[in-house]
Amino acid sequence: MITYEYPFNERIRTLLRLEDLFEKTAYFTQEDGALEHHAALVSMFEILEVAGRADLKMDLIQELERQRQTLLAFRNNPDISEEALSGALYEIEQSSAALLGMAGKIGQYLRENDWLMSIKSRAAIPGGVCEFDLPSYHWWLHRSPETRRDALEGWLKPMLPLRDAAAIVLRLLRSSGRPKNYTATNGQFQLNLGGSAAQMVRVTVHVDEQAIPEVSANKYFLNIRFTKPPAGEIKARGCERDVAFDLTFCNL
C-alpha cells in the first residue's frame, strides 16, 4: 500500500516538510560517506529555511497545549488506559518545555557560523561546492566519518525539539481519522464535504493499482483524479478505469 498525504493549510505543510527533512538528515548522517554527509548538511540547511517562520515555535507550543488540555479531559475515563494517558501527557509536557528552552530565532546559532553560511550560499548554486570553490569544506569532507558525524549531530541537536514537537502533532493528526474505502469511477472521484474542511487527507492505494492520486479541495468539495505512472510522457495521463482506494480525513 502507498499512502499519499495532502495537507490543506500552510502550517501542516510546514510540519510535513520538516518531518521529511529531519528524516533525510538523520539517514544521511548515519552513513559514512562524504557524499552522504554533504547531503545531510544540505538537508540541514533546508530545515533552517523551512523553520525560519517567526511564529512556528509558538504555533507548536500552542498546539501541544491544546492537545494536552484535550487529553486531560480523559482523566478517570474507564475506557482509557491511565498509563497510556499519563505517558502521552508526559511526552507533550517534555516537548513543550524543550521548545520553550529554545532561545532566540530557530537555528540562529547556525546563521552566526560564517563557515557554514558560506557553504549554504555556495550549495544554492548548481555545482557551487567544488573543491576550488570551498577548499576548507573539501578538507572537512576528507576528515574521518566519525569526526564529520559528530559535527553534524552537534549542529542539528539544538533543533531537535522542533523535530520532536512536529512528530507529536503529526502523529496525533494522522491518528485522528478512520479510513473509509471508496472507488474512483473511471479514475475520477468527488465528495461533498458540506462545508467542513479537514486539515489533511490521506489517500491509500494498493501498489498494484498503478494509479497516482491528484487531490484538490475546498470546504465544500474534495476532488481526486487518478493518473497513470509516468512513462516518458510529457503530460500526465488520466486513468480510464475504476480505482479502489482508502480515504482518511484528519483533523485536530
Swiss-Prot record:
The keyword rRNA processing does not apply. It comes from the Bacteria. Transmembrane segments: none annotated. GO terms for biological process: division septum assembly; FtsZ-dependent cytokinesis. Pfam families: ZapD. InterPro entries: ZapD, ZapD_C, ZapD_sf. Keywords: Cell cycle, Cell division, Cytoplasm, Septation. It is found in: Cytoplasm. GO terms for cellular component: cell division site; cytoplasm. Interacts with FtsZ. Cell division factor that enhances FtsZ-ring assembly. Directly interacts with FtsZ and promotes bundling of FtsZ protofilaments, with a reduction in FtsZ GTPase activity. PANTHER family: CELL DIVISION PROTEIN ZAPD (PTHR39455:SF1). Belongs to the ZapD family. NCBIfam families: PRK05287.1-4. This is Cell division protein ZapD. The gene is zapD.
